[in-house]
Amino acid sequence: MTNPGTLPESIRYCVVGAGIHGLSTAWHLARELKARGTGSGDDIVVIEKSAAGAGPSGIACGVVRNNYFQPAMRELMAHSVEVWDANAEAFEYHPVGYLQISYDEMRDDVLTIHEQQKDIGYESEFIDGEAETHAYMKGIFDDWRATGVSSVLHEKKGGYAHNMATVNGLLAKVQAEGVTVVSETLVTELVVDGGAVTHVVARRGVESSVIAVDHVIAAAGPWVPKLWEMLDLPDTTDIVSGGTTHTVPTWKFWALQEGTLDVDPGYLMNNAGDMPPVVHVDADATLCDEDGNVLVDGKWGIYYKPDFNFGGVQGGYMPYPVEKPWRDVAIDPYGPASPDFVVGEDFRAVWAAALSHCQSRFEGKAHLMSREPSGGIGAFTPDSFPVFDTFCDNVYVIADSNHGFKMVGVGALVAKELVGDVQGLLEPFRYSRYSLGKLHPESNSPYPWS
């Protein structure tokens, strides 16, 4: 192990990014190398441009769910939930379950999810019908009153985790394995020679270092497009669908909308006085504020939970696309420090109204919406699903398309691939799926990632 904060002159594995994926990969890779007698954490360095969890991982809502229409996503998330369950205390993970409450158009999709969850042994319950949905939700929250919904998928596994507690838990595991984590250091160049990356150039302050590498793991969240560009990979991607080829930008950004209602988290306990499941509602009822003004005339979706980490009822609303080429998007400063991508009054009004639409306890509470800056952006792939694949012979790209925080187990699978064991759970997420037309099915959810 090199001294903390010191870059090595050469290293076998260089991980770029100290968020969920970078840290999980480093931790699991160190364990894989040790178990096989082929190395240890001393063979790995993690380079982070700021500090661990300074990107989306550190501001994430922390929801852990299996609710995906795509079979490959469900199977991948079932694996990650096992990792969450096995490390619940270290990651401050709360397995309270997850509720997907949906409108009519989503009914068949959600029923399919339930049926296929049974096939993979992921426990859930499906409630069908408007009256049945209302009765089921009243059994959890006696003030439930949402309209425009007619089914419930109740996942008995899943829940949520405290974001920075999870990051710090992973960081402790990484450092316990002897991995060096270097912060405040920016990767400025990936030197390609003979089709592979031979050196990583990194700058700390005004000093640059050149590191000889055998493998690079690009796990930089919304900064992955910058690493992609360093590798001279394509700006556009050809997608084959229905016998037709469509050329689309490889990367696009979406702005995330999350916030907190400043009430005691205990305000959202269930009828038994216990922590409730995470609530996700997709409705097609007109959404109005307390004065009767129409805020949304059409489909909308929110998610929320009591959260002692955020200090209130925390959650979010549908993201919106950033309508400009990715190079024109100011990724930094990231998150709440951004002058461009923090939520405004429109979000606060809609989210507070949606809470009140669902539960009467939130009526008249719009003025309690936190004014603390919140928000962030995510780099999305051409189909809004992850890409996990090797490029330039020795660069493993983890592009999670903003599904990331919940996928804490992806690092375990990537680690196995880095030592030569191809993982079936990752096969559906290769970049080649676009040109081969092996696309994930699309749901009727108003969200781009469900």
Language-model-derived ranges and their functions:
Residues 7-10, 92-100, 134-178, 197-201, ...:
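Helix-loop-beta segment of a Rossmann-like dinucleotide-binding subdomain
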Residues 30-57:
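Glycine-rich FAD pyrophosphate-binding loop
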Residues 61-140, 149, 301-302:
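Dinucleotide-binding Rossmann-like beta1-alpha1 core, especially the glycine-rich loop
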Residues 175-188:
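A conserved beta-strand/loop element that lines the FAD pocket in flavoprotein oxidoreductases
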